[in-house]
């Protein structure tokens, strides 16, 4: 982690947290408690914290969900930087010339069908009343990926 950018707050016009004095990271359930303790200690000392807590962190925090922790995760459960303070974020790059290729699913049709079947089975069994089934997509980007975000943040006219 080299830094974290927020397009709004706490500073007007965007906020950048750069050059963390330390990075707190938990990749496994056993690393979660020490990471949370380190985060709280840094907060108590008056440091700024910026980073993320992954969705899968819930599996480590709730014993009932622990067996459902996805295997082969490729991102930490916790990744948090300790910073001295925020600074104004630099202007975003011009999005002209950035192109994104066609989106393609990163799951096979068989994997998708199996996930839909499992979701329907959970609902039918009364284990849940809805499922937000998502799956990863990929696309090739030509140009600066940060400039690509400018396109997605731009207001869109209502139809």
Model-identified regions with their sequence ranges:
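Extended alpha-helical targeting/anchoring segments
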Residues: 1-159
